[in-house]
Amino acid sequence: MKASEIRSTFLKFFESKGHQIVGSSPVVPGDDPTLLFTNAGMNQFKDVFLGFDKRPYSRATTSQKCIRAGGKHNDLDNVGYTARHHTFFEMLGNFSFGDYFKHDAISYAWELLTEHFKLPKDKLWVTVYSEDDEAYEIWNKVVGVPAERIVRIGDNKGARYMSDNFWMMGDTGPCGPCTEIFFDHGEGIPGGPPGSPDEDGDRYIEIWNNVFMQFNRTEDGVMHKLPKPSVDTGMGLERITAVLQHVHSNYEIDLFVALLAAAKAAVESAGGKDVDPESPSLKVIADHIRACSFTIVDGVIPGNEGRGYVLRRIARRAIRHGYKLGARTPFFHKIVAELVAQMGEAYPELRAAQARVTEVLKQEEERFFQTIQHGMEILEHALAGGTKQVDGETAFKLHDTYGFPVDLTADVCRERGVTVDQAGFDAAMEHQRSQARAAGKFKMAAGLAYSGAPTAFHGYEHLVCETSKVVAIYVDGTPVDAAQAGDDAAIVLDHTPFYAESGGQAGDSGELRNGSTRVVVADTFKIQADVFGHHGRIVEGSVKVGDSFVAKVDAELRAKTVRNHSATHLMHKALREVLGAHVQQKGSLVNAERTRFDFAHNAPVSDAQIRQVEAIVNAEILANAAASAQVMALDDAQKSGAMMLFGEKYGETVRVLSIGSSKELCGGTHVKATGDIGLFKVVAESGVAAGIRRIEAITGDNALAYLQSLESTVNGVASALKSAVPEVPARISGLQDQVRALEKELAALKGKLASSQGDSLLAQTVDINGLKVLAVVLEGADAATLRTTMDQLKNKLKTAAIVLAAVDGGKVQLAAGVTADSTAKVKAGELVNFVAQQVGGKGGGKPDMAMAGGTDPSKLAAALASVPGWVGERV
């Protein structure tokens, strides 16, 4: 059966069971701001399950377009290198909204798989939640699946109800157990049954998940039975197609065979020569054309933010892989026609948008091909020196100047065994963003043409102005005489208590009221040095130039902000005391949540130094010293010893704030006395650039809540360790000693196990012209065990070429050894690389001993089987 026939069979089967066939929702969720992209069949029915929406049917079936390439669900890095990862996939599903439940859901699934898809019953395994006896009984007694092929899965993710077989929509809300159906590919494929230590192999593949929503979880963690339980199922079309077409990779199904052929032709038409049809890069391109095309169909275009940036990342990743294969002109857009041929019938919107999709992708390619060659040259230069990590500045330059998303750079580096300095990249990105934010504020303010009188600021003394007259209104940057309910506007008042953002302190929020008119002010900024814009939404009534309002600052948020601002001054002084007079402020952000303070210092601030700073600041708070502000001439301020920011421009008169032992020039709002701060706590310390450190701190009730949370965590740890809080460090130290002892014991046991295996493996040697050849897997071995066992086997076999392998966590470890008398003909380094290349890796070493790694355990058996032939060609 073709993929299109499988999709049709699924939908028609459930239609025959009374289900409404519902079209796929867009990959861009229209009514769920919590989702970047649609990533499951149930997304469009979320409000139905939650009881917020009703449909004219209680049974539904869909084939849903899904994307997993951003946010929590992100498969992008794995695509092209595994058999089943995709950025775009189709999720087949059937749903019951308070209609049928477990019996019918399980029976329908079994009937479709065994009677319509003709899957052998003895090839199907199922899992159930360990406490779901009802599902177990249905599978065993009603359907007839033998007990040995039904696996109970418990809470295997570290907490109650945290299980592969228990589904939750969130921390609260509908949830319930699920049952999963697996297909056994047979003994020739490595891997164990679900629930076993080897379950991550490719032998047993999950093809269908049935979720039974029968509980509502409340905030206290209690499970309450739902009055009308529901069913949500999902089966990946690509996976079931691979099973029905008797192939082990999704990229071998008919749909992808066609797309891979089109991708190969497109790349070769753009300069690629004799492209390997098995190349992972072709798989990347074939996968990404689906994600890009359907995202564009649903209204997204490549950009630098949100979904547009995810689309750009996917498209440019595909283009880079084409470039790797030799393409030097646009090629990616040429594959759209084949995609439409394959999927246009099922998704008419794709066929209708073919020309637009092609043009959007072509334009994106043309844009990237202008810079990709130069960018790759820069990246190649960075990689040429044998570095193990590309620095963040280079990665950011590639991103900012040459359009390389950082994960594209990381993709190239990963192929060379090199990493990217993500922290350095993030710091460079944040620096640019902060500059952009500042520029944005300036542009917004500069774009508002204002020539009236300055704003009189009363916010140092008052939080309310009873009569504030509107002197200007701006909507979308345009001056207007009036604004209506629903408008977002910037309003200039003649008098205001609102502090406008400056000096690192966030602008005030609050409200303007006048009879039936109410404006919620979200932010206050400076249009000019002495003209304040109040940015907010008119929620009731209307506003006209000349109207008078009561202007009221949000007192709670102002109080939190001034606590943080005053604490920043005390912290600055304390840092100079503890670290030295070289400490100078380099930037700050003060709002109601916290203070963030950047300063010059060339080393991390130690925990002990942070404790000193906290002690100094909290001592100032306990002293409850009054704060005072004076306006004076700049010369007088300098003579008074007030601290000034180097490079800052000041007017002839300045405002000097004295608080505790601190004296600084500052135009911000502050507490009346240090005691008003309440409590001061540093919560983070980090480096943001060379010679620049950053401290984040909180005050008042935020600091108290933070400490209470820490106390709760420590008490929880103590409870888990069954010890008193003061004894926790010693208890943890004791457990660490135990772990080290157990690890040592485990290593010894592994050595004994390997030794015993080594004796039994001698019988598997093959004699080739007098050279004994052995290529086997050592169960439970690690790299050290492979080396030890290799030495033992070489001593016993005398004249031999040996390859030992171990699989752990989806990775392959290899060791090759050749006895000294045979290295002239067979070299261990060449031998281990021959095997490693077959399992997606590489390695090296000496002629008599070499190590390697690989990423594809599924090909290990074949790789080991090829060793005797390779050796035979050399002896």
Curated annotation (Swiss-Prot):
The Gene Ontology biological process terms listed for this entry are: alanyl-tRNA aminoacylation; negative regulation of DNA-templated transcription
**GO CC terms for this protein?**
cytosol
This protein's UniProt keywords? Aminoacyl-tRNA synthetase, ATP-binding, Cytoplasm, Ligase, Metal-binding, Nucleotide-binding, Protein biosynthesis, RNA-binding, tRNA-binding, Zinc
Question: Has keyword Aminoacyl-tRNA synthetase?
Answer: yes
Instruction: Tell me, in a sentence or two, what this protein's role is.
Output: Catalyzes the attachment of alanine to tRNA(Ala) in a two-step reaction: alanine is first activated by ATP to form Ala-AMP and then transferred to the acceptor end of tRNA(Ala). Also edits incorrectly charged Ser-tRNA(Ala) and Gly-tRNA(Ala) via its editing domain.
* Protein name, per record: Alanine--tRNA ligase
Checking NCBIfam families in the record gives: alaS
- Cofactor field: Zn(2+)
PANTHER family the UniProt entry points to: ALANINE--TRNA LIGASE, CYTOPLASMIC, ALANYL-TRNA SYNTHETASE
The record's section on InterPro entries has: aa-tRNA-synth_II/BPL/LPL, Ala-tRNA-lgiase_IIc, Ala-tRNA-ligase_IIc_anticod-bd, Ala-tRNA-synth_IIc_core, Ala-tRNA-synth_IIc_N, Ala-tRNA_ligase, Ala_tRNA_ligase_euk/bac, DHHA1_dom
Going by the record, the broad EC class of this enzyme is: ligase
Instruction: Write one Gene Ontology MF term.
Output: zinc ion binding
- Report which reactions are catalysed by this protein: tRNA(Ala) + L-alanine + ATP = L-alanyl-tRNA(Ala) + AMP + diphosphate
Reading the lineage from the top rank, the first entry is Bacteria
The UniProt record lists the EC number as: 6.1.1.7
Subcellular localization is given as: Cytoplasm
| UniProt source species | Leptothrix cholodnii (strain ATCC 51168 / LMG 8142 / SP-6)
